């Protein structure tokens, strides 16, 4: 069979000694070959299939690598943009409007502002609780050193003069012990044991009594005695007999 013309040739097969001597006969080509579907695409011829396969076929690994490279480029650009933004960003304080490079520094600074405001609120509340006191002094105890010391102020009496600002102040723990203070001892003026003398004998002026002795059992039984001495003896103190009481007090009931 001639491949070019498609005509058959007659040959003598009786004298053939081996299969290699037999001619190789091919099937004639179809004029309209059937298309071959590969990866969802139809291929009709060998040459066309090779060209279309090379043009249309894409390696999935190559596409994946290209996508990863594009993503890396995008992330790199985003990271550079974020770094530039972070370097240019400043954290501003809401209280004093100062700028800080990091959020941690801003947080510590604003915590200090909050602490200062809490202390200021406590000071204002204590000032309104004790309105007569100086706002810059310690507010829980009376300041007895603001004015001249008198016997009436020291021993709880009533004085005609102006009272100090700490006179109405009460201790924070609710006790009245903080209001009683001993005056500075003057030599020869106050006799610490005048209310407890017996048989005309008195102890030395250097001896001191407790801070607060308000015993009513130690009242003087002498009716005609000095009113000031009776009043002072009720608190455990008395004046020396040789010293006159120069404090002008109204002791009439």
From Swiss-Prot:
GO terms for cellular component: nucleus. SUPFAM superfamilies: beta-beta-alpha zinc fingers. Residues 11-21, 49-63, 76-85 have a biased composition (Polar residues). Residues 1-85 are annotated as: Disordered. Induction: By gibberellin. The keyword ATP-binding does not apply. InterPro entries: GIS/GIS2/ZFP8, Znf_C2H2_sf, Znf_C2H2_type. It holds the Pfam family zf-C2H2_6. A zinc finger (C2H2-type) spans 91-113. Residues 1-10 have a biased composition (Acidic residues). Expressed in inflorescence meristems, floral meristems and stem epidermis. GO terms for molecular function: DNA-binding transcription factor activity; transcription cis-regulatory region binding; zinc ion binding. It is found in: Nucleus. The keyword Manganese does not apply. Disruption phenotype: Reduced trichome production on cauline leaves, stem internodes and branches, and sepals. Keywords: Developmental protein, Differentiation, Gibberellin signaling pathway, Metal-binding, Nucleus, Transcription, Transcription regulation, Zinc, Zinc-finger. One of its GO terms (biological process) is regulation of DNA-templated transcription. Probable transcription factor required for the initiation of inflorescence trichomes in response to gibberellin (GA). Mediates the induction of GL1 expression by GA in inflorescence organs and is antagonized in its action by the DELLA repressor GAI. Acts upstream of the trichome initiation regulators GL1 and GL3, and downstream of the GA signaling repressor SPINDLY (SPY). Does not play a significant role in the cytokinin response. Controls trichome branching through GA signaling. Acts downstream of the key regulator STICHEL (STI) in an endoreduplication-independent pathway. Plants over-expressing GIS have delayed shoot maturation and flowering, and a strong production of trichome on the inflorescence. This is Zinc finger protein GIS. It comes from Arabidopsis thaliana (Mouse-ear cress).
């Amino acid at each position: 069979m001639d491949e070019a013309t498609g005509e058959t040739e007659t040959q003598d097969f009786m004298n053939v000694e081996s299969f290699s001597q037999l001619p190789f006969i091919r099937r004639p080509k179809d004029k309209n070959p059937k298309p071959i579907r590969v990866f969802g695409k139809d291929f009709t011829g060998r040459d066309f299939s090779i060209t279309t396969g090379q043009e249309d076929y894409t390696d999935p690994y190559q596409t994946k690598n290209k996508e990863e490279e594009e993503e890396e480029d995008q992330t790199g650009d985003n990271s550079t943009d974020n770094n530039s933004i972070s370097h240019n960003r400043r954290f501003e304080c809401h209280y004093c409007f100062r700028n800080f490079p990091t959020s941690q520094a801003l947080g510590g600074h604003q915590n200090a502002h909050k602490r200062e405001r809490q202390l200021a609120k406590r000071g204002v509340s204590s000032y309104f609780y004790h309105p007569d006191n100086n706002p810059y002094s310690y507010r829980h105890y009376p300041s007895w050193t603001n004015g001249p010391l008198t016997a009436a102020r020291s021993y709880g009496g009533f004085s005609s003069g102006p009272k100090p600002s700490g006179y109405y102040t009460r201790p924070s723990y609710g006790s009245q012990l903080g209001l009683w203070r001993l005056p500075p001892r003057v030599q020869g003026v106050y006799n610490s044991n005048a209310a407890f003398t017996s048989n005309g004998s008195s102890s030395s002026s250097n001896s001191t009594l407790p801070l607060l002795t308000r015993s009513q059992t130690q009242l003087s039984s002498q009716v005609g005695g000095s009113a000031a001495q009776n009043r002072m003896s009720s608190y455990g103190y008395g004046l020396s007999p040789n010293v006159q009481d120069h404090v002008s007090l109204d002791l009439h009931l």
